[in-house]
């Protein structure tokens, strides 16, 4: 059995601009943004956090390596990625940026060098900005550096 260890790591979609929908409650055009995972290890995603100018955003994720989607259809980001505890603006100060993450029931394993496509659409009727973090661990083979003789 190969020895493995996990290192905490965060991948993120940063400063994603989402075009306004035609009106509140109307789903806008889905826009794709990609996130490339490193080629040095698998990644075990364990929780999501996000901050946006308005949390009325629909999202869906597709893993390009397998072509599989994480959901059967687009979901409101608030229902799958937790939510900011104090406010929801991208311009939060350090004191205000307290997040309530959305932990996964089981880690979601992403293969090395995978590209994840986030499809996002505004539902608020206003131009939206989004940042989203994937919290988890890089799964590495071999002895942990802190356990080496």
PLM features: residue spans?
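Beta-strand-centric surfaces of beta-sandwich/beta-rich domains
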Residues: 1-149
């Amino acid at each position: 059995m190969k020895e493995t260890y996990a290192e905490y790591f965060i991948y993120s979609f940063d400063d994603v601009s989402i075009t306004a929908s035609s009106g509140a409650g109307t789903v806008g055009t889905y826009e794709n943004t990609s996130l490339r995972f490193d080629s040095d290890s698998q990644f075990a995603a364990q929780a999501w956090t996000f901050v946006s100018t308005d949390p009325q955003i629909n999202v869906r994720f597709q893993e390009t390596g397998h072509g599989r989607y994480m959901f059967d259809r687009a979901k409101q980001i608030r229902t799958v990625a937790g939510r900011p505890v104090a406010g929801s603006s991208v311009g939060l100060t350090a004191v205000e940026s307290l997040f309530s993450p959305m932990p996964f029931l089981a880690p979601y394993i992403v293969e090395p060098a995978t590209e994840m496509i986030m499809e996002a659409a505004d539902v608020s009727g206003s131009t939206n900005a989004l940042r989203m973090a994937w919290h988890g661990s890089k799964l590495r083979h071999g002895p942990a550096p802190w356990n080496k003789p």
